A protein has these predicted regions:
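Outer-membrane beta-barrel domain signature, especially the mid-to-C-terminal portions
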Residues: 126-130
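Conserved small/polar residues in nucleotide/adenosyl-binding loops
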Residues: 136-137
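Secreted, periplasmic, or luminal enzymes acting at the cell surface/secretory milieu
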Residues: 1-108, 112-118, 122-124
Length: 137
């Protein structure tokens, strides 16, 4: 099955749609690079966009080599900003967006929804995945 899948991808019969579930660092010294880290004292420096953090690496970029969610495809998608709608009688929020295939071939896109807890009785990760959906267009 594996070889057949690779052949179908190489010949364009299928479109790759996978995304990285982790960040890939430039070198081992950047590990861990993840969204599951809890909040620390490092804050972005807003005054100088070239020096985004209070600390930085001297020989490699601060950003990972391949960031979380990176993926390749034969097509391209656009996703509108999310729309939030609070339900009147329930303690829940509906979140929606529109996904459009702007490429020339059919494909699949993973739409992911993350939350950030600003104030909680316990320390929470910076971002937590709460919902995802695979859209074939």
């Amino acid at each position: 099955m594996g070889a057949e899948a690779v052949v179908r991808l190489v010949y364009g019969e299928e479109t790759p749609s996978g995304k990285l579930s982790v960040s890939i660092p430039w070198c081992v010294g950047q590990v861990p690079v993840s969204y599951w880290d809890v909040k620390t004292g490092h804050r972005m420096v807003e005054t100088n966009p070239e020096n985004r953090f209070t600390s930085r690496y001297m020989d490699i970029p601060n950003e990972p080599l391949y960031p979380f969610g990176f993926g390749l495809s034969y097509t391209e998608f656009t996703i509108t900003p999310p729309i939030f709608e609070k339900q009147e009688r329930e303690d829940k929020i509906d979140i929606s967006c529109k996904v459009k295939n702007v490429g020339e071939v059919p494909g699949a896109e993973v739409v992911q929804c993350y939350v950030e807890t600003l104030c909680a009785p316990v320390v929470r990760p910076d971002r937590e995945l709460i919902r995802l959906s695979l859209i074939h267009i």
